Amino acid sequence: MSHRDTLFSAPIARLGDWTFDERVAEVFPDMIQRSVPGYSNIISMIGMLAERFVQPNTQVYDLGCSLGAATLSVRRNIRHEHCRIIAVDNSPAMIERCRRHIDAYKAPTPVEVVEGDIRDITIENASMVVLNFTLQFLEPAERQALLDKIYQGLNPGGALVLSEKFSFEDAKVGELLFNMHHDFKRANGYSELEISQKRSMLENVMLTDSVETHKSRLRKAGFEHSELWFQCFNFGSLVALKAGVAA
Protein backbone atom coordinates (compact mmCIF):
# COMPACT_ATOMS: atom_id res chain seq x y z
CA MET A 1 0.00 0.00 0.00
CA SER A 2 1.30 3.45 -0.92
CA HIS A 3 1.19 6.30 1.57
CA ARG A 4 0.95 10.04 0.99
CA ASP A 5 4.30 11.77 0.65
CA THR A 6 4.84 14.02 3.68
CA LEU A 7 8.59 13.37 4.02
CA PHE A 8 9.56 17.03 3.74
CA SER A 9 6.53 18.71 5.30
CA ALA A 10 8.47 19.72 8.43
CA PRO A 11 11.85 21.52 8.51
CA ILE A 12 14.85 19.16 8.39
CA ALA A 13 17.98 20.50 10.10
CA ARG A 14 20.49 18.51 8.05
CA LEU A 15 19.11 17.54 4.68
CA GLY A 16 22.01 15.56 3.21
CA ASP A 17 21.84 14.03 -0.27
CA TRP A 18 18.89 12.15 -1.71
CA THR A 19 18.70 8.38 -1.28
CA PHE A 20 16.06 5.87 -2.36
CA ASP A 21 15.63 4.43 1.13
CA GLU A 22 12.72 2.72 2.86
CA ARG A 23 11.00 6.03 3.65
CA VAL A 24 11.08 7.07 -0.01
CA ALA A 25 10.02 3.62 -1.24
CA GLU A 26 6.98 3.69 1.04
CA VAL A 27 5.60 6.90 -0.51
CA PHE A 28 7.16 6.63 -3.98
CA PRO A 29 3.97 6.05 -6.04
CA ASP A 30 2.35 9.15 -4.53
CA MET A 31 5.58 11.16 -4.75
CA ILE A 32 6.23 10.50 -8.41
CA GLN A 33 2.63 11.09 -9.49
CA ARG A 34 2.60 14.46 -7.71
CA SER A 35 6.14 15.44 -8.80
CA VAL A 36 6.63 14.23 -12.39
CA PRO A 37 4.18 15.67 -14.92
CA GLY A 38 3.08 13.10 -17.47
CA TYR A 39 4.44 10.12 -15.52
CA SER A 40 1.31 7.99 -15.94
CA ASN A 41 1.24 8.72 -19.67
CA ILE A 42 4.87 7.68 -20.05
CA ILE A 43 4.28 4.44 -18.17
CA SER A 44 1.24 3.48 -20.25
CA MET A 45 2.96 4.42 -23.51
CA ILE A 46 6.02 2.35 -22.62
CA GLY A 47 3.58 -0.55 -22.75
CA MET A 48 2.42 0.54 -26.20
CA LEU A 49 6.03 0.68 -27.37
CA ALA A 50 6.62 -2.79 -25.93
CA GLU A 51 3.75 -4.13 -28.01
CA ARG A 52 5.53 -2.83 -31.11
CA PHE A 53 9.13 -3.74 -30.32
CA VAL A 54 9.32 -6.79 -28.04
CA GLN A 55 10.04 -9.90 -30.09
CA PRO A 56 9.64 -13.61 -29.24
CA ASN A 57 12.61 -15.31 -27.60
CA THR A 58 14.17 -12.00 -26.50
CA GLN A 59 14.75 -10.06 -23.31
CA VAL A 60 13.57 -6.67 -22.03
CA TYR A 61 15.63 -4.72 -19.49
CA ASP A 62 14.14 -2.17 -17.09
CA LEU A 63 17.24 -0.44 -15.71
CA GLY A 64 16.49 1.50 -12.54
CA CYS A 65 13.11 -0.18 -12.20
CA SER A 66 12.14 1.37 -8.82
CA LEU A 67 8.81 -0.27 -7.88
CA GLY A 68 8.30 -1.92 -11.26
CA ALA A 69 5.71 0.34 -12.92
CA ALA A 70 7.41 0.24 -16.33
CA THR A 71 8.07 -3.50 -16.02
CA LEU A 72 4.39 -4.19 -15.35
CA SER A 73 3.36 -1.97 -18.27
CA VAL A 74 5.71 -3.86 -20.59
CA ARG A 75 4.55 -7.25 -19.34
CA ARG A 76 0.87 -6.38 -19.85
CA ASN A 77 1.58 -5.58 -23.49
CA ILE A 78 3.90 -8.40 -24.58
CA ARG A 79 2.13 -10.44 -27.25
CA HIS A 80 4.79 -13.11 -27.80
CA GLU A 81 5.96 -16.26 -26.06
CA HIS A 82 9.35 -17.01 -24.54
CA CYS A 83 10.16 -13.43 -23.56
CA ARG A 84 11.76 -12.42 -20.28
CA ILE A 85 11.96 -9.11 -18.42
CA ILE A 86 14.98 -8.26 -16.26
CA ALA A 87 14.24 -5.46 -13.79
CA VAL A 88 17.25 -3.95 -12.01
CA ASP A 89 17.63 -1.43 -9.18
CA ASN A 90 20.37 -0.77 -6.64
CA SER A 91 18.01 0.22 -3.81
CA PRO A 92 17.20 -2.71 -1.47
CA ALA A 93 14.02 -0.95 -0.30
CA MET A 94 12.81 -0.44 -3.87
CA ILE A 95 13.67 -3.99 -4.91
CA GLU A 96 11.82 -5.52 -1.96
CA ARG A 97 8.64 -3.64 -2.83
CA CYS A 98 9.14 -4.20 -6.56
CA ARG A 99 9.15 -7.96 -6.03
CA ARG A 100 5.87 -7.71 -4.13
CA HIS A 101 4.29 -5.61 -6.87
CA ILE A 102 5.43 -7.98 -9.63
CA ASP A 103 4.23 -11.05 -7.71
CA ALA A 104 0.80 -9.47 -7.19
CA TYR A 105 0.08 -9.55 -10.93
CA LYS A 106 0.15 -12.90 -12.68
CA ALA A 107 1.21 -13.05 -16.32
CA PRO A 108 2.94 -15.60 -18.57
CA THR A 109 6.06 -13.47 -19.12
CA PRO A 110 8.60 -14.14 -16.34
CA VAL A 111 10.29 -11.23 -14.57
CA GLU A 112 13.69 -11.50 -12.93
CA VAL A 113 14.07 -8.76 -10.31
CA VAL A 114 17.74 -8.01 -9.63
CA GLU A 115 19.25 -5.93 -6.86
CA GLY A 116 22.39 -4.52 -8.43
CA ASP A 117 24.21 -1.73 -10.18
CA ILE A 118 22.91 -1.19 -13.72
CA ARG A 119 26.49 -0.45 -14.82
CA ASP A 120 27.40 -4.06 -13.99
CA ILE A 121 24.48 -5.75 -15.76
CA THR A 122 25.17 -7.60 -19.01
CA ILE A 123 22.76 -6.59 -21.77
CA GLU A 124 22.18 -9.33 -24.33
CA ASN A 125 19.52 -10.50 -26.77
CA ALA A 126 17.44 -7.43 -25.96
CA SER A 127 14.55 -6.25 -28.08
CA MET A 128 13.80 -3.35 -25.72
CA VAL A 129 15.57 -1.48 -22.91
CA VAL A 130 13.94 1.04 -20.57
CA LEU A 131 15.80 3.80 -18.69
CA ASN A 132 12.90 5.58 -16.99
CA PHE A 133 14.27 8.57 -15.03
CA THR A 134 17.45 6.65 -14.24
CA LEU A 135 20.33 8.03 -16.31
CA GLN A 136 20.12 11.39 -14.53
CA PHE A 137 21.30 9.73 -11.31
CA LEU A 138 24.52 8.41 -12.87
CA GLU A 139 27.66 10.52 -12.92
CA PRO A 140 27.70 12.33 -16.29
CA ALA A 141 31.07 10.78 -17.18
CA GLU A 142 29.52 7.29 -16.86
CA ARG A 143 26.45 7.84 -19.04
CA GLN A 144 28.01 7.28 -22.45
CA ALA A 145 29.46 3.90 -21.45
CA LEU A 146 26.04 2.67 -20.32
CA LEU A 147 24.39 3.77 -23.57
CA ASP A 148 27.19 2.11 -25.55
CA LYS A 149 26.57 -1.14 -23.67
CA ILE A 150 22.83 -0.94 -24.25
CA TYR A 151 23.29 -0.40 -27.98
CA GLN A 152 25.64 -3.38 -28.23
CA GLY A 153 23.18 -5.60 -26.35
CA LEU A 154 20.14 -4.62 -28.40
CA ASN A 155 19.14 -6.81 -31.32
CA PRO A 156 18.70 -5.19 -34.76
CA GLY A 157 15.39 -3.32 -34.77
CA GLY A 158 15.46 -2.95 -30.98
CA ALA A 159 14.42 0.14 -29.02
CA LEU A 160 15.68 2.11 -26.04
CA VAL A 161 13.22 4.27 -24.10
CA LEU A 162 15.04 7.06 -22.24
CA SER A 163 12.94 9.24 -19.90
CA GLU A 164 14.58 12.14 -18.08
CA LYS A 165 14.20 15.53 -16.50
CA PHE A 166 15.77 18.01 -18.92
CA SER A 167 17.86 21.13 -18.70
CA PHE A 168 17.66 23.73 -21.46
CA GLU A 169 20.29 25.65 -23.37
CA ASP A 170 17.85 28.56 -23.70
CA ALA A 171 17.81 30.04 -20.19
CA LYS A 172 14.48 31.83 -20.72
CA VAL A 173 12.74 28.61 -21.74
CA GLY A 174 14.43 26.73 -18.91
CA GLU A 175 13.17 29.26 -16.36
CA LEU A 176 9.63 29.11 -17.73
CA LEU A 177 9.44 25.31 -17.63
CA PHE A 178 11.11 25.20 -14.20
CA ASN A 179 8.44 27.55 -12.84
CA MET A 180 5.63 25.64 -14.52
CA HIS A 181 6.90 22.43 -12.94
CA HIS A 182 6.82 24.11 -9.54
CA ASP A 183 3.27 25.28 -10.23
CA PHE A 184 2.42 21.65 -11.02
CA LYS A 185 3.79 20.51 -7.65
CA ARG A 186 1.97 23.27 -5.79
CA ALA A 187 -1.26 22.30 -7.53
CA ASN A 188 -0.68 18.74 -6.31
CA GLY A 189 -0.50 19.84 -2.68
CA TYR A 190 3.22 20.35 -2.05
CA SER A 191 4.17 23.34 0.10
CA GLU A 192 7.04 25.73 -0.62
CA LEU A 193 9.00 24.08 2.21
CA GLU A 194 8.51 20.59 0.75
CA ILE A 195 9.53 21.74 -2.74
CA SER A 196 12.60 23.58 -1.46
CA GLN A 197 13.87 20.79 0.81
CA LYS A 198 13.47 18.09 -1.82
CA ARG A 199 15.22 20.25 -4.42
CA SER A 200 18.14 20.82 -2.03
CA MET A 201 18.54 17.08 -1.46
CA LEU A 202 18.40 16.25 -5.17
CA GLU A 203 20.66 18.97 -6.55
CA ASN A 204 23.90 17.06 -5.99
CA VAL A 205 22.67 13.64 -7.12
CA MET A 206 20.29 14.33 -10.02
CA LEU A 207 22.25 16.07 -12.77
CA THR A 208 20.16 16.83 -15.83
CA ASP A 209 21.11 17.13 -19.50
CA SER A 210 19.54 18.87 -22.47
CA VAL A 211 17.66 16.93 -25.13
CA GLU A 212 20.49 17.82 -27.51
CA THR A 213 23.07 16.26 -25.18
CA HIS A 214 21.01 13.08 -24.93
CA LYS A 215 20.66 12.83 -28.71
CA SER A 216 24.39 13.40 -29.16
CA ARG A 217 25.19 10.54 -26.77
CA LEU A 218 22.72 8.26 -28.49
CA ARG A 219 24.29 8.97 -31.89
CA LYS A 220 27.74 8.33 -30.46
CA ALA A 221 26.53 4.99 -29.04
CA GLY A 222 25.44 3.98 -32.54
CA PHE A 223 21.70 4.59 -32.54
CA GLU A 224 20.68 5.50 -36.07
CA HIS A 225 17.38 7.09 -35.07
CA SER A 226 16.29 8.96 -31.93
CA GLU A 227 13.55 11.44 -31.17
CA LEU A 228 11.66 13.03 -28.32
CA TRP A 229 8.25 11.34 -28.29
CA PHE A 230 6.82 12.84 -25.10
CA GLN A 231 7.37 16.04 -23.14
CA CYS A 232 5.55 17.87 -20.35
CA PHE A 233 7.36 20.95 -19.05
CA ASN A 234 10.95 19.92 -18.25
CA PHE A 235 10.25 16.18 -18.22
CA GLY A 236 10.11 13.91 -21.22
CA SER A 237 11.07 10.72 -22.97
CA LEU A 238 13.08 9.81 -26.05
CA VAL A 239 13.00 6.66 -28.12
CA ALA A 240 16.19 5.47 -29.82
CA LEU A 241 16.15 2.76 -32.48
CA LYS A 242 18.84 0.36 -33.59
CA ALA A 243 18.81 -0.13 -37.34
CA GLY A 244 17.91 -3.47 -38.84
CA VAL A 245 14.99 -5.82 -38.91
CA ALA A 246 14.04 -7.91 -35.90
CA ALA A 247 14.61 -11.61 -36.50
Swiss-Prot record:
Its EC number is 2.1.3.-. It catalyses: prephenate + S-adenosyl-L-methionine = carboxy-S-adenosyl-L-methionine + 3-phenylpyruvate + H2O. Keywords: S-adenosyl-L-methionine, Transferase. One of its GO terms (biological process) is tRNA wobble uridine modification. S-adenosyl-L-methionine binds at Y39, G64, C65, S66, D89, N90, D117, I118, N132, R199. It comes from the Bacteria. GO terms for molecular function: carboxyl- or carbamoyltransferase activity; S-adenosyl-L-methionine binding. Belongs to the class I-like SAM-binding methyltransferase superfamily. Cx-SAM synthase family. Homodimer. Catalyzes the conversion of S-adenosyl-L-methionine (SAM) to carboxy-S-adenosyl-L-methionine (Cx-SAM). This is Carboxy-S-adenosyl-L-methionine synthase. The lineage of its organism: Bacteria, Pseudomonadati, Pseudomonadota, Gammaproteobacteria, Enterobacterales. The gene is cmoA.
